[in-house]
């Protein structure tokens, strides 16, 4: 691994443009958004509906960047920071794999440059100030039963989904129901990822909805005078992090909102700075095209004024077989063919946005030639560009064919949005459900309708950031492949007025995950020489 300062110098940066975090990590100045103004090409990486283990989207993003470098392209990648929850939960580390990783992987996976702790601290500071205000006389007349801002922690802990605070003597504060969300679902995480500078950051923080008064009036962070101290905690967290891939490609790793319960992409400032310094930027969006990619098209690219010049859609034989209903071990060509319906629907989704995608078939050792041939023939018959990706095993060399296909697909596309910003919220939600998920319609619970009414009273033209299972186009994780004849049910709607969007809660989605029966944490250890093992 090279010293990060060598890579920074190759990027043409001076010492005023960055701060070192040891030998291998750095933070970049926000002022780099204003230099060069290159007309870089932005390539978005998304996926088909995933299995629980994921389909290798991060690995593909990293490997594709390395393949671009081998072809002599001036390229950087942009991915999200890992959350401790999944690292210790079901997926383990989230820094790629094999010969396509970002380094130093153990540092990045475990706390990195301190962004997540800073975001958690800023979030919980507001929670503390809300309760403190109520305790010291409650001048704003906040209703303790109508506090809408939760607490946060970067850990999977189902016991924190619903709690009671203030239990004990009177000096413990008011007794009230409360809850935690995981840090990637925090509105402060979303705000950090969507802010362009410190002024923008403070403005967004000031608009966070804390709760309502006993007379049903909204109370915001600005009313509690919280935004300044919150922004102070986030000063360094807003600056994007730079590391490197296995083969020395510059890698922006910044912010970490989940794609199923938040907007699911790395920060806007990371993408904007990368596009000023490089000719090609490859950025990743969480889960399938119905989640992270939809939000990138409809929210992130709008706020950041970002182009989308190509889309890579990651697929695996494993996921195709799952959606095809495979019940057996080993080769199952018929299941691959049946599961292709899911992949084709994701292709159709990307085409609706006005972009022609390239499918990256992420190869696993268990894949057979017959299975690969079967899906290849289907993609060919539909006129879909595709390539086998072997970047896990071979690094950049294993992504050369994919890189060439992606380069040939790059264009100045006119993006077609799912909804207009000025449309009412019900219409926006229905358009996403029908046009992206393939639903027959939307069922709004009474609470959801009340939430929407309140959101439209206190927000101007908000975006919609759906919270939905990643395992199905529907809101039911058991409806695999290409479901039809369903309606999605909106249980409630969270108001993220600071971030500028509402979050409709579909089905049984949880904003605080739990650990599995055998969490990855059981396999992680620290050796006597200080090496961390079992994380990947």
From Swiss-Prot:
Record-linked PROSITE patterns: FTHFS_1, FTHFS_2
Q: Which GO terms describe its molecular function?
A: ATP binding; formate-tetrahydrofolate ligase activity
Protein family per UniProt? Belongs to the formate--tetrahydrofolate ligase family.
> Has UniProt tagged this entry with the keyword Ligase?
yes
Matching SUPFAM superfamilies, A to Z?
A: P-loop containing nucleoside triphosphate hydrolases
Q: Name one GO biological process term.
A: tetrahydrofolate interconversion
Q: What is the lineage of its organism?
A: Archaea, Methanobacteriati, Thermoplasmatota, Thermoplasmata, Thermoplasmatales
Q: Which Pfam families match?
A: FTHFS (PF01268)
Pathway assigned in UniProt: One-carbon metabolism; tetrahydrofolate interconversion
Q: Which reaction does it catalyse?
A: (6S)-5,6,7,8-tetrahydrofolate + formate + ATP = (6R)-10-formyltetrahydrofolate + ADP + phosphate
Q: Which organism is it from?
A: Thermoplasma volcanium (strain ATCC 51530 / DSM 4299 / JCM 9571 / NBRC 15438 / GSS1)
Please report the name of this protein according to its UniProt entry. Answer: Formate--tetrahydrofolate ligase
Q: Where does ATP bind?
A: 51-58
């Amino acid at each position: 691994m090279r010293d990060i300062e060598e890579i920074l110098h190759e990027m043409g940066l001076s010492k005023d443009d960055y701060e070192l975090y040891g030998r291998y990590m750095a933070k970049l100045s926000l002022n780099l958004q204003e230099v060069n103004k290159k007309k870089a090409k932005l390539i978005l990486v998304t996926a088909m509906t995933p299995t629980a283990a994921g389909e290798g989207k991060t690995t593909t993003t990293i490997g594709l960047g390395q393949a671009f470098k081998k072809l002599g392209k001036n390229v950087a990648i942009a991915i999200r920071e890992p959350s401790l929850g999944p690292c210790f939960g079901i997926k383990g580390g989230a820094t790629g794999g094999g010969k396509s990783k970002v380094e130093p992987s153990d540092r990045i996976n475990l706390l990195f440059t301190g962004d997540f702790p800073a975001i958690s601290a800023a979030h919980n500071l507001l929670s503390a100030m809300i309760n403190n205000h109520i305790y010291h006389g409650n001048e704003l007349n906040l209703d303790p039963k109508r506090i809408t801002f939760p607490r946060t922690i970067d850990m999977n802990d189902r016991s924190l989904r619903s709690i009671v605070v203030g239990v004990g003597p009177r000096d413990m504060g008011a007794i009230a129901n409360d809850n935690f969300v995981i840090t990637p679902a925090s509105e402060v995480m979303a705000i950090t990822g969507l802010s362009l500078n410190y002024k923008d950051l403070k403005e967004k923080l000031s608009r966070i909805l804390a709760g309502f008064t006993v007379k049903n009036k909204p109370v915001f962070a600005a009313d509690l005078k919280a935004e300044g101290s919150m922004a102070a905690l986030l000063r360094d967290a807003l600056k994007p992090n730079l590391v490197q891939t296995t083969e020395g490609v510059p890698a922006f790793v910044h912010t970490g909102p989940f794609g199923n319960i938040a907007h699911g992409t790395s920060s806007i400032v990371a993408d904007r700075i990368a596009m000023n310094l490089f000719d090609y930027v490859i950025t990743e969006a969480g889960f399938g095209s119905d989640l992270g990619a939809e939000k990138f098209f409809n929210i992130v690219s709008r706020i950041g004024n970002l182009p989308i010049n190509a889309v890579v859609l990651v697929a695996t034989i494993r996921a195709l077989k799952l959606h095809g209903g495979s019940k057996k071990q080993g080769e199952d060509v018929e299941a691959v063919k049946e599961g292709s319906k899911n992949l084709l629907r994701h292709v159709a989704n990307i085409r609706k946005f006005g972009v022609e995608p390239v499918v990256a078939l992420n190869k696993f050792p268990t894949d057979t030639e017959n299975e690969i041939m079967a899906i290849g023939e289907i993609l060919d018959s539909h006129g879909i560009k595709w390539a086998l990706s072997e970047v896990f095993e071979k690094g950049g060399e294993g992504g050369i064919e994919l890189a060439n296909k992606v380069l040939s697909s790059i264009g100045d596309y006119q993006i077609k949005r799912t909804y207009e910003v000025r449309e009412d919220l019900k219409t926006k939600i229905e358009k996403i459900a029908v046009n992206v998920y393939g639903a027959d319609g939307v069922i709004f619970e009474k609470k959801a309708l009340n939430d929407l009414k309140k959101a439209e009273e206190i927000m101007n033209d908000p975006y919609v950031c759906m919270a939905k299972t990643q395992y199905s186009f529907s809101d039911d994780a058991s409806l695999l492949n290409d479901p039809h004849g369903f309606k999605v049910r909106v249980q409630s709607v969270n108001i993220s007025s600071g971030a500028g969007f509402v979050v409709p809660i579909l089905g049984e989605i949880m904003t605080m995950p739990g650990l599995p029966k055998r969490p990855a944490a059981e396999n992680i250890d620290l050796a006597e020489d200080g090496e961390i093992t079992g994380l990947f």
